[in-house]
UniProtKB/Swiss-Prot annotation:
This is (E)-2-((N-methylformamido)methylene)succinate hydrolase. GO terms for molecular function: hydrolase activity, acting on carbon-nitrogen (but not peptide) bonds. It comes from the Bacteria. PANTHER family: MONOACYLGLYCEROL LIPASE (PTHR43798).
């Protein structure tokens, strides 16, 4: 992977990893992660695609947004990144918070998106689920960083899960606390922002989760795919929130089929 930096407006920079040649595939990770969190997909797809994995604002080496930034600000950031890359319409995939950003870009700037993929996204949370995630965002604001609870929620005890868990733990331990807090608040408040725009998405849309992800549920996944004009829902058995790391072969297979669909 080649480490690169985009120069954005207002003296901000966006860091990304780049590998491979071909159609552009842009990847956006979730809250608390970094560009490397797509490592199985970068390795696999860079054989035939031009893969660009971005550090979200305030994560990795990318400049943070303002502390009060909302989901729309992260979407504007992604739009500016795609413009600055100057690759034309891209295949855009997001995980978790990255999925909300991907949805926002696809709804507001369809001219920039050839295909879109949402992995472990959220859609119209229940009241209880929304309250729980807002409470977690508030705890972060107060400086309480709980690493073990999400790790227990995201990973089981298989060998591949233990390996992925160690990498994710390291990223969380080294997270920029203010950038993490800003992104988590936007994530907590963002599930409704573009939810009603799914019916406007006309490009091929892959929506994927695991059966055992309690917050990005199979029901949400099916609803999103059903709303899109050309949506496909895939729910992988016995997988949780970090499915791209714990079931990379199945995720790569689903994404490969998505990339081969005709826009």
């Amino acid at each position: 992977m080649i480490s690169k930096t985009l120069q954005l407006s207002n003296n901000r920079t966006a860091h990304y990893f780049e590998q491979g040649e071909g159609e552009p595939l842009v990847l956006i990770h979730g809250v608390g992660m970094q560009a490397e969190a797509w490592y199985p997909q970068i390795e696999y797809f860079s054989k035939h695609y031009h893969v660009i994995s971005l550090d979200m604002p305030g994560h990795g080496q990318s400049t943070a947004l303002a502390a009060d930034a909302q989901l729309q600000d992260f979407v504007d950031w992604a739009i500016e990144c795609i413009h600055t890359l100057n690759l034309g319409p891209v295949n855009l995939a997001g995980h978790s918070m990255g999925s909300l950003i991907t949805t926002g870009v696809s709804v507001t700037r369809p001219d920039l998106v050839k295909r879109m993929a949402v992995l472990n996204g959220v859609y119209k949370r229940t009241h209880a689920a929304r309250e729980a995630v807002i409470q977690r965002a508030e705890a972060l604001k107060q400086g309480h960083l709980d690493i073990e609870t999400p790790l227990q929620r995201w990973f089981g005890q298989s060998e591949i899960e233990k390996i992925a868990s160690e990498r994710v733990k390291l990223w969380l331990e080294n997270v920029n606390m203010s950038g993490y807090t800003t992104a988590y608040r936007a994530f907590a408040q963002g599930d409704l922002v573009y939810a009603d725009g799914w019916s406007d998405i006309e490009c091929p849309a892959l929506v994927l989760t695991g059966t055992d992800d309690p917050n990005s549920t199979a029901e949400m996944t099916i609803q999103m795919a059903h709303q899109a004009k050309h949506g496909t829902a895939i729910v992988i058995e016995n997988e949780r929130h970090m499915v791209n790391l714990t079931a990379p072969e199945k995720v790569n297979q689903a994404m490969q089929a998505w990339l081969e669909t005709t826009p």
